[in-house]
């Protein structure tokens, strides 16, 4: 190579050194100084891995003083280059810049510049980059984006609600499904969609203190959303980092008590510019027109500042009309401002719901019902549809469905309220109770007697709580190490049950973590029973491991011993046997326990075993739950109401279980209340609202479509290729699981989402649902999205060179493969990717500009090519640089037509869809006041901004590959 002092070269292997200067040359070696790092490199002259940096007319270059110029002419004298052109800052023409004064921090970003500078990538990286562009573009266009990536079962009614609400601008809705139907999952799906699409960036979740960790776990494990938990300590720490502590995190969970306890804290929350507010257990916010509670006022204040609000609450029938109105008032105070008016409106919807029930049942409608439907829908040309619906023709069924859809659009609160019931959703198992009455040991009898004497001054409630857990009373007197399990008949029964059901997975729940730990030791030491423990003292990772061990079919734990708090938010529906070693204090906790197994997707009837000690509070409570509330074998929406109404009497019976006079009457009264309330709830069911919330056949089709997308083999092939190139080790564990661990040769030292210890992944939804320590990989998983971002945001794979062995073509024939990207720049919240995601356009040009891409498919062509090492590649590029420049100009001339066609198609699609949505809502606004003005304004503004952004769309060269034909 001819080297001259002052020439500028770039290292082929260490491009991060920047532009080097030749500072010494002798017969065998050359020394380069790299000013940007201050380092020297000594190379052999004969075969050094460096490339001469030469710019061409039209290029923009930067001087070491920082000014830029457009090159118009290049002169060479004694091996040194001088660039002549126009300065961009002063517009002075004829400026000369010698190459020695070029900026040393030079970075080649354009693919062609990287190619000509010898920065040649491996061939497989070019292929990965193109696939990443292609798949990324396709995923943005896929229907149901944002609904495919969560680790949940594909349950139609949940998907229906999430699909409807998740696409709205700043949704403000009430999620009021019955217990066990997945309100938390619905909220998570909505958040996931909004965050993924860019419609929301900052989210605040407010929950009761006891549910904070449940939400934290659910959001992380199911949706890969990493929330920060704010309590007093975290809030105080964050005050050192920002004026508003809540500005330090994008996704925050805090308790309602934490939010309302301090005026300054509430002000900080209101000022933090959240996009979405989620409030769980919203039915506990007490409201009346005269005296709203402090908790209600705190949420009301927040709801005024946050555009999107999701309230999770009990069903409207459980709440009562006034309480239900109070929730709706938080969502839209302008619409729901008068309780009396609201009551009147609700009465008016009853005949509509009845008519819908008749439509669905296929019954003929009377003239009065037809007239009422016509008035309710309010369309001028509705008469033919009504007649068709009431006829015996083949079109009758579709006409009835269309009428139901129109009614749902216009129905009072159907846009702000979603409510599913177990009656309306299929797929729940039966629950069968098995009570085991056991004698009270003398040791407990003595301890209870002494406790009664010593605790005479305790309140009835405290005594009742003590009496539920006799082993704790015994330990109070004998010490924490007292071996109560040696004589407690529940332990003997449990061991006998487990040894006779070795093949069954059994979930055992008890109130206290200490009880769970002691039981595990006894089961292991006495019977060799494999038991995992799960309690609040364990970290999330430790709980995951315990849950995963329990989930393993052959070598896993037979038993999972859970404490009350530790099991919150975890579902184990692969098991169907539950043992309640003791009983919880209220019916909500009882339902929460059973809810660990009683979920949609449970394949077997649930066997609930309750071993209880006679003459204790347990014997009182088991009868009250079963005979008074029927709470074991059926969900009990009336439980809390009845519990509150008989609380004092119940406490007294629990505190003094030997005094049972009148207890039978209490049970009888509770059962009567339960039946009456249940009938009242059933009567108050709103069938129209249920149909809207459930989604019917449309929701079923949605679930089936996502299930089909789960089988995308392209994802697996792409992910493995991506992990290989990033440098992530992959170890097949079997059972559709792979362990990923970082290697020493990764593209980046710390890859987001991959810990030092590694992670276990699966592409199988069922495996992910059964094993909580396994991450479910989809196109929406952060690991894939971070990988795509790593490849596409940098220059990985943007320039390469390959050899094509083909004797049908002359040796030395050149082909240039160009990957252009057509894109538009816009704020993320406009969700422009729905219409024009960054879209690759592939061209394969010969020296005459003939585009062969349509005839030569990428993957087929890629398999015919051979790699070239970087050093040889640099020599080839230098030899054909002028020819490549000419082909690039031909490509630039051709891309405009293809790009314009894509942009025009995107404009037409955006205009059609956004205008249609606006027109639909404007028409409905006349008959349904629940369509908010700000929603209409936002859609119109969004449409205008989208169209303006698409008008500014352009294209750029993203990657290129030089192909040289050889016969060897």
Swiss-Prot record:
Keywords: Activator, ATP-binding, DNA-binding, Helicase, Hydrolase, Nucleotide-binding, Transcription, Transcription regulation. A motif (DEAH box) lies at residues 280-283. PROSITE patterns: HELICASE_ATP_BIND_1, HELICASE_CTER. It is an enzyme of class 3 (hydrolase). Residues 490-662 form the Helicase C-terminal domain. Transcription regulator that activates transcription by stimulating RNA polymerase (RNAP) recycling in case of stress conditions such as supercoiled DNA or high salt concentrations. Probably acts by releasing the RNAP, when it is trapped or immobilized on tightly supercoiled DNA. Does not activate transcription on linear DNA. Probably not involved in DNA repair. PANTHER family: DNA ANNEALING HELICASE AND ENDONUCLEASE ZRANB3 FAMILY MEMBER (PTHR45766), SWI_SNF-RELATED MATRIX-ASSOCIATED ACTIN-DEPENDENT REGULATOR OF CHROMATIN SUBFAMILY A-LIKE PROTEIN 1 (PTHR45766:SF6). Belongs to the SNF2/RAD54 helicase family. RapA subfamily. This is RNA polymerase-associated protein RapA.
């Amino acid at each position: 190579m001819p080297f001259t002092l002052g020439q500028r070269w770039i290292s082929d292997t260490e491009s991060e050194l920047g532009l080097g200067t030749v500072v010494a040359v002798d017969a065998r070696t050359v020394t380069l100084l790299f000013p940007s790092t201050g380092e020297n490199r000594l190379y052999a002259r004969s075969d050094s891995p460096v490339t001469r940096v030469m710019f061409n007319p039209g290029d923009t270059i930067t001087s070491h003083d920082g000014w830029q110029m457009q090159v118009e002419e290049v002169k060479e004298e004694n091996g040194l280059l001088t660039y002549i052109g126009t300065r961009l800052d002063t517009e002075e023409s004829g400026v000369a810049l010698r190459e020695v004064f070029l900026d040393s921090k030079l970075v080649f970003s354009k693919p062609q510049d990287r190619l000509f500078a010898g920065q040649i990538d491996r061939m497989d990286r070019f292929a990965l980059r193109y696939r990443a562009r292609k798949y990324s573009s396709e995923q943005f266009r896929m229907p149901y984006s944002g609904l495919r990536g969560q680790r949940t079962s594909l349950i139609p009614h949940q998907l229906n609600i999430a699909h409807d609400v998740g696409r709205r601008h700043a949704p403000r809705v009430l999620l009021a499904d019955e217990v066990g139907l997945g309100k938390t999952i619905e909220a998570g799906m909505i958040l996931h969609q909004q965050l993924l699409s860019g419609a929301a960036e900052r989210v605040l979740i407010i929950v009761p203190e006891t549910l904070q960790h449940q939400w934290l776990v659910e959001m992380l494990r199911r949706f890969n959303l990493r929330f920060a938990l704010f309590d007093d300590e975290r809030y105080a720490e964050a005050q050192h980092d920002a004026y508003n502590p809540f500005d330090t995190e994008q996704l925050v969970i805090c308790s309602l008590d934490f939010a309302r306890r301090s005026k300054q804290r509430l002000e900080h929350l209101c000022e933090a510019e959240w996009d979405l507010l989620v409030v769980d257990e919203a039915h506990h916010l007490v409201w009346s027109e005269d005296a709203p509670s402090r908790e209600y006022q705190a949420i009301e204040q927040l709801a005024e500042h946050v555009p999107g609000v999701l309230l999770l609450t009990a069903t409207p029938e459980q709440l009562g009309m006034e309480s239900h109105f109070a929730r709706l008032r938080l969502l839209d105070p302008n619409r729901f401002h008068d309780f009396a008016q609201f009551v009147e409106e609700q009465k008016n919807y009853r005949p509509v719901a009845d008519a819908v029930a008749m439509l669905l049942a296929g019954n003929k409608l009377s003239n009065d019902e037809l007239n009422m439907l016509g008035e309710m829908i309010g369309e001028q040309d509705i008469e033919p549809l009504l007649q068709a619906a009431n006829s015996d023709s083949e079109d009758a069924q579709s006409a009835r469905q269309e009428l139901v859809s129109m009614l749902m659009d216009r129905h009072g609160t159907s846009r702000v309220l979603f409510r599913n019931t177990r009656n309306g959703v299929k797929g729940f198992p039966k629950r069968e109770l098995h009570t085991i009455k056991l004698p009270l040991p003398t040791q407990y009898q003595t301890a209870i007697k002494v406790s009664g004497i010593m605790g005479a001054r305790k309140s009835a409630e405290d005594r009742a709580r003590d009496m539920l857990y006799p082993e704790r009373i015994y330990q109070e007197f004998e010490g924490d190490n007292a071996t109560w399990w040696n004589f407690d008949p529940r332990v003997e029964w449990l061991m006998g049950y487990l040894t006779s059901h070795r093949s069954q997975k059994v979930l055992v729940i008890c109130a206290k973590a200490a009880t769970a730990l002691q039981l595990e030791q006894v089961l292991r030491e006495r019977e060799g029973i494999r038991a995992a423990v799960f309690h609040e003292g364990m970290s999330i990772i430790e709980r995951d491991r315990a849950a995963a061990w329990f989930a393993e079919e052959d070598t896993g734990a037979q038993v999972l011993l859970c404490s009350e708090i530790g099991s919150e938010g975890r579902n184990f529906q692969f098991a169907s046997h539950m043992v309640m070693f003791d009983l919880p204090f209220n019916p909500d906790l009882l339902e929460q326990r059973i809810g660990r197994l009683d979920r949609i997707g449970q394949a077997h009837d649930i066997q609930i075993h309750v071993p209880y000690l006679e003459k204790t509070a347990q014997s009182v409570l088991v009868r009250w739950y079963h005979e008074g509330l029927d709470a074991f074998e059926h969900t009990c929406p009336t439980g809390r109401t009845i519990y509150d109404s008989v609380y004092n009497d119940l406490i007294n019976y629990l505190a003094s279980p030997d005094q049972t006079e009148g207890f039978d009457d209490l049970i009888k009264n509770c059962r009567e209340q339960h039946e009456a309330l249940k009938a009242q709830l059933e009567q108050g069911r709103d069938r129209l609202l249920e149909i809207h919330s459930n989604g019917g056949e449309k929701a079923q089709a949605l679930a089936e479509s996502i299930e089909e997308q789960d089988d995308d083999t392209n994802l697996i092939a792409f992910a493995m290729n991506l992990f290989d190139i990033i440098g992530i080790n992959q170890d097949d564990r079997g059972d559709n699981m792979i362990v990923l661990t970082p290697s020493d040769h990764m593209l980046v030292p710390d890859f987001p989402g991959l810990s030092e210890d590694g992670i276990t992944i699966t592409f199988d939804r069922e495996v992910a649902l059964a094993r909580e320590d396994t991450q479910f990989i989809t196109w929406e998983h952060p690991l894939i999205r971070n990988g795509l971002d790593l490849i596409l945001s940098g220059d990985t794979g943007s320039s390469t060179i390959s050899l094509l062995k083909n004797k049908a073509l002359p040796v030395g024939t050149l082909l240039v493969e160009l990957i252009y990207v057509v894109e538009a720049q816009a704020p993320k919240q406009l969700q422009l990717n729905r219409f024009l995601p960054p879209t690759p356009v592939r061209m394969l040009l010969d020296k005459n500009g003939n585009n062969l891409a349509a005839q030569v498919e990428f993957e087929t062509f890629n398999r015919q090519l051979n790699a070239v090492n970087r050093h040889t590649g640099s020599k080839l590029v230098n030899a054909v640089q002028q020819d490549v420049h000419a082909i690039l100009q031909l490509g630039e001339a051709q891309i405009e037509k293809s790009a314009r066609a894509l942009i025009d198609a995107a404009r037409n699609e955006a205009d059609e869809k956004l205008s249609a949505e606006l027109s639909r809502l404007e028409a409905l606004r006349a008959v349904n006041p629940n369509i908010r003005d700000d929603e209409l304004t936002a859609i119109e503004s969004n449409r205008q901004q989208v169209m303006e952004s698409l008008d500014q769309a352009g294209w750029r060269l993203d990657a290129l590959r030089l192909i040289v034909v050889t016969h060897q």
